[in-house]
């Protein structure tokens, strides 16, 4: 099969997403990409969203982290930026640790909830971060 899978498969996935989450189904031709696992997906996503033409591209990763985050960032031409997650903060990513100058260069943020390997569940803090960005 082709890398993108068959049209019937992508249509089926798009329909399931719409039914499962009660949202408009994504466009199967441009917004659905079947993958063989998370590793392939994370690499493909970084290759898609990191703009190599922009200087100083950065990708934010939790630390400790799934090593694929780092490899995908580097392969996409970006510099990984690590946010330490530690016990005294409940293993939460401390978003305020990133200076505004770094945020301006961030092109991708890898987040896993529940976190691996910490088990931290991200709730409303991620929505607040997303809404604060241009």
What are these regions (language model features)?
Residues 36-40, 44-47, 61-79, 87:
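Substrate-binding/gating loop at the entrance of the active-site cleft, primarily
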Residues 10-58:
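Phosphate-binding glycine-rich loop
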Residues 85-134:
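Active-site phosphate-binding strand-loop segment of PLP-dependent enzymes
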Residues 1-15, 114:
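A structural motif shared across PLP-dependent enzymes of the aminotransferase-like
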């Amino acid at each position: 099969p082709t890398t993108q899978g068959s049209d019937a498969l992508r249509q089926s996935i798009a329909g399931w997403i719409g039914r499962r989450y009660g949202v408009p189904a994504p466009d199967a031709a441009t917004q659905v990409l079947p993958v063989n696992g998370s590793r392939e997906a994370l690499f493909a996503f970084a290759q898609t969203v990191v703009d190599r033409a922009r200087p100083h591209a950065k990708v934010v990763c939790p630390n400790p982290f799934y090593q694929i985050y780092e490899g995908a960032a580097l392969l996409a031409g970006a510099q990984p930026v690590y946010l330490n997650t530690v016990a005294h903060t409940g293993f939460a990513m401390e978003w305020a640790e990133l200076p505004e100058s770094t945020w301006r260069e961030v092109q991708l943020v890898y987040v896993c909830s529940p976190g691996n390997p910490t088990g931290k569940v991200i709730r409303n803090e991620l929505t607040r971060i997303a809404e604060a960005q241009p």
